[in-house]
Amino acid sequence: MESFLFTSESVNEGHPDKLCDQVSDAVLDACLAQDPDSKVACETCTKTNMVMVFGEITTKANIDYEKIVRDTCRSIGFVSADVGLDADNCKVLVNIEQQSPDIAQGVHGHLTKRPEDVGAGDQGHMFGYATDETPELMPLSHVLATKLGARLTEVRKNGTCAWLRPDGKTQVTVEYNNDNGAMVPIRVHTVLISTQHDETVTNEQIAADLKEHVIKPVIPEKYLDDKTIFHLNPSGRFVIGGPHGDAGLTGRKIIIDTYGGWGAHGGGAFSGKDPTKVDRSGAYIVRQAAKSIVANGLARRAIVQVSYAIGVPEPLSVFVDTYGTGKIPDKDILKIVKENFDFRPGMISINLDLKRGGNARFQKTAAYGHFGRDDPDFTWETVKPLKWEKVPASS
């Protein structure tokens, strides 16, 4: 069996694009907490000493946008200009308007439609993916890259590696076998970490600390061997980071948010969007469908696509592919999916409880991935029991 290499990357919560995702979702959380019917399309951008929130929001909630921006930046660790942004003294610009009445009447009839009649907020197609290679039913390359990033933040905030600063990126290359369509990880081929750091630390200490406190606790020993390659801050210096180093924008890390390059992506970002935006709710329901297919033993690996037209409740199409790993034909799995999942946007909101804000619910999704997380707020990760007849093995 010939092996192959596949790579996934991640970025930390202090990466400028991820800062923007978290601000946009913090605004969404605040709106939904006060008014579950809020219509939110909130974008954020940032550059040196400046964060701007802009977009269309229709809500009864009373929102202090500037406070949300500063609180979010502070919680990430942007507390002074030398780490990339000073949450308390940076410029905060706000340019929020109401949702277009044309869109409002077409999608939700100015709140007069029943949930099952609510139309999709826009056209588009979304994909959900699942694979049996990890307990999370997520790709290993993506899981490891994501967990390395989360661990970097953990050891920065708890003081284990006090030289760390908020910005950082990770990348993991995994060697796989293809077992008749199922993905079987063999080993980790390469680990790349580029992390922002202070002026005092040496490259030797960076490498030693990253191996001991970040890589060791995250990557299971069985995947590492003496051939595994480590690139630890290969550029040699990463002091300037965050919005000081690069501009940031909501919605620019859509592969990190999903499956690390596996499966497919329809192109729509998640953060700052309320559940009538099918870019988000549609992607969540097809993840639940794909995960349920694999968890119920219908297949070892699955991708599910759904598509929509603006103002139309029923999906235009639903597609299932199990990459040849299905225990029954894909057309039969598709039938089971259609019988068990309601893809109408208003019903997705109800069935996945997506109008509930607060508890930093959506802000949590905005760093370290929307899928494969063990958190009751991530309702789309709940596996639905699917009834199906096992085909008797031929003698």
From Swiss-Prot:
Single GO MF descriptor: methionine adenosyltransferase activity
Binding site for ATP: H15, D167, G168, K169, S235, G236, R237, F238, D246, R252, K253, A269, K273, K277
Binding site for L-methionine: E56, Q99, D246, K277
Pathway it works in: Amino-acid biosynthesis; S-adenosyl-L-methionine biosynthesis; S-adenosyl-L-methionine from L-methionine: step 1/1
Cofactor comment text: Binds 2 divalent ions per subunit. The metal ions interact primarily with the substrate. Can utilize magnesium, manganese or cobalt (in vitro). Binds 1 potassium ion per subunit. The potassium ion interacts primarily with the substrate.
UniProt key word Cell wall biogenesis/degradation: no
Any single biological process term in GO: one-carbon metabolic process
Residues the entry annotates as binding Mg(2+): E9
Presence of keyword Zinc: no
EC number: 2.5.1.6
Keywords carried by this UniProt record: ATP-binding, Cobalt, Cytoplasm, Magnesium, Metal-binding, Nucleotide-binding, One-carbon metabolism, Potassium, Transferase
Pfam families attached to this UniProt entry: S-AdoMet_synt_C, S-AdoMet_synt_M, S-AdoMet_synt_N
Superkingdom per UniProt: Eukaryota
Matches recorded under PANTHER family: S-ADENOSYLMETHIONINE SYNTHETASE
Name of this chain's protein: S-adenosylmethionine synthase 2
Gene behind this protein: METK2
